């Protein structure tokens, strides 16, 4: 059993986590005011509500909404008035929501007019990622993943989506980062998704010279990595072991050829010859014409793209 970091969105009870709490970012700020800054309780509640309203108004204005400083003042007065009416020393989360609903929502609170409430919930939920204490039990695979993310400046401390553009044909560092992201996709940890770029498996986007990836951390990423920790201590080792197993289990030539392409994209060139021997067996035993055509197309694409990926001569596949 290994401990796993949680993000604020994952810890939000409103997101489906029954043991969580609503608005974790709101209460985190309140905790900091009370215990780290030593602020008086009533003053801490009031200041967190005020800061949240101002932040919500600022982000709404950035989106083109007509929210003024006067609206923010009215929302705060509404929240304080409701707190007094409810015999509270200071406004809290529910008074904050009621104040924003009263002052920020213009017109009917329909699906089209509830952008202030949606944004308020997003702010109160937060996007931070927790940390584990030192000396914790972290599998080597998770440690290597974190090390690679730091190397390529990929975010792990936030649950926000991060866009990454890689010039894979002109920059060796970008090719190495692309291989790491392809390894994360192969291990199915849910961290990265390629939105654009040349696709050797499907034969699309061959006129593109850049890859565009979307990366987003979640608690499920580390959970998946923990499950795959049995395959190796590094991303490359775990991907290689899983690739070797899937190649041994492949029953069709087209599946074997696609695995060969995936190994190429992940930079696992040291396995190329061993995999090509297995693919040769599949080509000789597969009697399905469409499968053979798909396998030949994958092998042809692989042969034609080696030079662009800086791998000319590294994937000759003598067995084929």
What residue ranges belong to the model's regions?
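AAA+ ATPase "lid" subdomain C-terminal helix
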Residues: 83-88
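Extended repeat-based interaction scaffolds and adjacent low-complexity, acidic/S/T/P-biased segments
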Residues: 5, 70-71, 89-320
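Basic, alpha-helical interaction scaffolds
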Residues: 31-66
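Aromatic-enriched hydrophobic runs in primary sequence
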Residues: 6, 26, 65, 82, ...
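Catalytic or ion-translocation cores adjacent to nucleophile or general acid/base/metal-coordination motifs
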Residues: 1-32, 103, 107, 111
